[in-house]
Amino acid sequence: MGKAKFERGKPHVNIGTIGHIDHGKTTLTAAITKIAGLAGNGDYVAFDEIDKAPEEKERGITIATAHVEYETEARHYAHVDCPGHADYIKNMITGAAQMDGAILVVAATDGPMPQTREHILLARQVGVPGIVVFLNKCDMVDDEELLELVEMEVRELLSSYDFPGDDLPVIQGSALKALECESADEDAAKPILDLLAACDSYIEEPERDIDKPFLMPIEDVFSISGRGTVVTGRVERGVIKVGEEVEIVGIRDTAKTTCTGVEMFRKLLDQGQAGDNVGVLLRGTKRDEVERGQVLSAPGSINPHTKFKAEVYVLSKDEGGRHTPFFSGYRPQFYFRTTDITGVVTLDEGVEMVMPGDNATFNVEMINPIAMDPGLRFAIREGGRTVGAGVVTEILE
C-alpha cells in the first residue's frame, strides 16, 4: 500500500497513551493505527516498530518515544507512546511531546495500579487538558459486574485528581483482539472506532499558538544608530504588529514601550508571528534597559514571579546528571527560555532528599523575577551542566 498523503486541511491534535506497565498502551497504539488504516485513515504501525522507539534528546535528557500518526474524518492525530515508565515521566515533565489530550489505558484484569495513579497525577500537574479512558483486556473478564466496578474505580480515581471522572468517556475493549481484525467492520474493531470518536468529540482542539497573546523571549539586544534599540528572538506565541504597545517583563521592573519596526532576514515586515525569528525595534528604549532573559509581551498578558511550585525530573548519573543526592536549601540555576537565574529549592514536608533519577515537587524562590505562567518548562543547571528538567505547576508569588 502506498503512503497516503495527509490532508493538512484537518485540525491537528497531539495525543498520547498513558497508564501502568503491561496494561496494553503500545498494543492499543498499534491497534489504533491498524483500524484507522483499515478505515482508510493512515498506515498501520506494528507493535514491534513502536516498542523499539528511538531515543531523542530534549533539554539534555534522553527519552525514548514512539511517534505514529493517523486520521479520523474530523482530525489529524500525532500520537506518542513511550516504552518505559521513566520515559513517560521525563516526557510529561520536559514537554518533549506536547499532549492536547491523553488516552489512559487500564487493564480490566488489574484495575488502576501505582503507575496509573502516577500518570494521572502528572497529567494533572503538567496540565494535560483532557483524558479519555480505554478499559483494555475486557475479553479476559467474564463478569459484567466486575467490568462495571473497575470502570467505577477508574472514574473515582480520575475525579480524585480533579479530572471530570463522571463525565469523561470510558471505552471497553481489547486492543489485542482489535489487532487481529482484517476489516474495520468486525466487532473487535468497534471499540477502537468508538475510542477515536470519543477523542474527536471529547478532547478539545488546542488553541493555536498564533491566536494566543504575543510573547517573544529576548535572546539578543542591539542598538542601531539613529533608529534605536532592536531585540531579537523567536516569537513563541501570538502576533506583533508595527505600532503596537508591548511590555518588557522579567528580571527588572516591567517597562512599557512601542514596537516601531519588525524585521526578518534583513527585510522589514509589518508584523511577526509565532515561529518567526525576528528583530523588533523598540521606541525610546535604551540598549541598557533591556537584556537577554526578559520577554517582550502583549501588555498585561504575563507577569514576573520569583516563587513557584514545580514538578521536576532529576537526571540520573548515567544521563550525565549529579552523582549525589541534594537536600532542601539546594541552590542551582534555573534556565528559563534564554537565561539562567539562581534559585533556592525547598522540598515538600517529609521529603528528606532527592536522588539522581527521581522526580519530585520543588518549591523554588529565585533571586530575580521571570515572566511565567503555569506550564512553563525549564532546565536545572549547575555550572552550565543540565542536571534536571521541570515544569511550573503553580505560581506562589
Swiss-Prot record:
Residues 136-139 are annotated as: G4. Monomer. It is an enzyme of class 3 (hydrolase). It holds the Pfam family GTP_EFTU_D3. Keywords: Cytoplasm, Elongation factor, GTP-binding, Hydrolase, Magnesium, Metal-binding, Nucleotide-binding, Protein biosynthesis. Residues 174-176 are annotated as: G5. This is Elongation factor Tu. It comes from the Bacteria. One of its GO terms (molecular function) is translation elongation factor activity. Residues 81-84 are annotated as: G3. Its EC number is 3.6.5.3. GTP binds at residues 19-26, 81-85, 136-139. HAMAP family: EF_Tu_B. One of its GO terms (cellular component) is cytosol. Mg(2+) binds at T26. GTP hydrolase that promotes the GTP-dependent binding of aminoacyl-tRNA to the A-site of ribosomes during protein biosynthesis. Belongs to the TRAFAC class translation factor GTPase superfamily. Classic translation factor GTPase family. EF-Tu/EF-1A subfamily. The gene is tuf. Residues 60-64 are annotated as: G2.
